[in-house]
């Protein structure tokens, strides 16, 4: 099995909250797709609660589009990481990390403005696979944490696992 890009970086050295360009690729038509690692928690030290990350998934996708789409950028998808330490965001375009960080902070401020669980988009049995597994309070705690911190930049070159370490890990 090929080594995926997300496993070629040293998770013991990642900062959070932080933005990282996880991957860029070009489509056959010449569009650039950029995948961002939006790291909310320090890997192996912190984790977002399942109800909070699920609620945040419903809110974050729309709020990030409100603040980032336009000027050559269109978000394709924002999805939580299985490890519950962040989200991956795929988009068309090449915004710099600061633009992404600013949109992220604005989206977190929007999460804090949601006053009632009934305002969570697509929170029903028809549009959500686990519609009862939500917590607005937990999502807002996550948002407060991001707003209380500086969003940094994680750099792939600085985080790259050395070839020796990859060999040691049998990868």
From Swiss-Prot:
InterPro entries: LuxS_sf, Metalloenz_LuxS/M16, S-ribosylhomocysteinase. It catalyses: S-(5-deoxy-D-ribos-5-yl)-L-homocysteine = (S)-4,5-dihydroxypentane-2,3-dione + L-homocysteine. SUPFAM superfamilies: LuxS/MPP-like metallohydrolase (SSF63411). It comes from the Bacteria. Its cofactor is Fe cation. GO terms for biological process: quorum sensing. Its EC number is 4.4.1.21. Pfam families: LuxS. It is an enzyme of class 4 (lyase). Binds 1 Fe cation per subunit. GO terms for molecular function: iron ion binding; S-ribosylhomocysteine lyase activity. Keywords: Autoinducer synthesis, Iron, Lyase, Metal-binding, Quorum sensing. Fe cation binds at residues 54, 58, 128. HAMAP family: LuxS (MF_00091). Belongs to the LuxS family. Involved in the synthesis of autoinducer 2 (AI-2) which is secreted by bacteria and is used to communicate both the cell density and the metabolic potential of the environment. The regulation of gene expression in response to changes in cell density is called quorum sensing. Catalyzes the transformation of S-ribosylhomocysteine (RHC) to homocysteine (HC) and 4,5-dihydroxy-2,3-pentadione (DPD). Homodimer. This is S-ribosylhomocysteine lyase. It comes from Salmonella arizonae (strain ATCC BAA-731 / CDC346-86 / RSK2980). The gene is luxS.
């Amino acid at each position: 099995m090929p080594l995926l890009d997300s496993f070629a970086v040293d998770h013991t050295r990642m900062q959070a909250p932080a933005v990282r360009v996880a991957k860029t690729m070009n489509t056959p038509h010449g569009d650039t797709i950029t995948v961002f690692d939006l790291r909310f928690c320090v890997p192996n030290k912190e984790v977002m609660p399942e109800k909070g990350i699920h609620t945040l998934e419903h809110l974050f996708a729309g709020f990030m589009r409100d603040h980032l789409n336009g000027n050559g950028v269109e978000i394709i998808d924002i999805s939580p990481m299985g490890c519950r330490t962040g989200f991956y965001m795929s988009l068309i375009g090449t915004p710099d990390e600061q633009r992404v960080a600013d949109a992220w902070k604005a989206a977190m401020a929007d999460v804090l403005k949601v006053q009632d669980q009934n305002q969570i988009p697509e929170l029903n049995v028809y549009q959500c696979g686990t519609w009862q597994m939500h917590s607005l309070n937990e999502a807002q705690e996550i948002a407060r944490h991001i707003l209380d911190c500086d969003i940094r930049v994680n750099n792939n070159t600085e985080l790259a696992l050395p070839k020796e370490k990859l060999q040691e890990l049998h990868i």
